[in-house]
Amino acid sequence: MIEQDGRILAIDRKDPVWPGLTFPGGHVEDHESFHDSVVREIKEETNLTIKNPRLVGVKQFYDHEDHRYIVFFYKASEFSGEVKSSEEGKLIWVTKEELMQRKLAYNFDHDLPVFFDENISEHLLDAARDELF
């Protein structure tokens, strides 16, 4: 999550599997640190170079074949460059309130407490549970 002056940078994803508003991000490449991954993905999707990203929580979920995935949630408020949308989708600056009124990507609303509540650091999602810790 990238923040500036009370606004949050969100991406309206074009992905047919997971369309809707979410935060920029992506996958970790082989032999890449999580830190380097978030810096690279943000650059690829927004054209911004973030500085001092802070890990704020994690999400774990399972796909339809019961493969486990772990997502690392970061926040950053220091960056350089100009915002530029990518093939991933259109970028928009929104307030927290505006974000909550938009069409979000599937289950993304369940991730948001990890970003906004410092007492919550984990989101577990599987066939039987959708819990925050």
Language-model region placement:
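Nudix hydrolase/Nudix homology domain
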Residues: 18-21, 89-133
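Short, solvent-exposed loop/turn elements at beta->coil junctions and helix N-caps
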Residues: 56-62
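Gly/Ser/Thr-rich beta-alpha loop segments that engage phosphate groups in nucleotides
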Residues: 22, 27-28
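Unchanged
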Residues: 28-51, 62-110
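N-terminal strand-loop-strand
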Residues: 1-22, 50, 54
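Residues in well-ordered beta-strands of folded domains
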Residues: 1, 24, 56, 75, ...
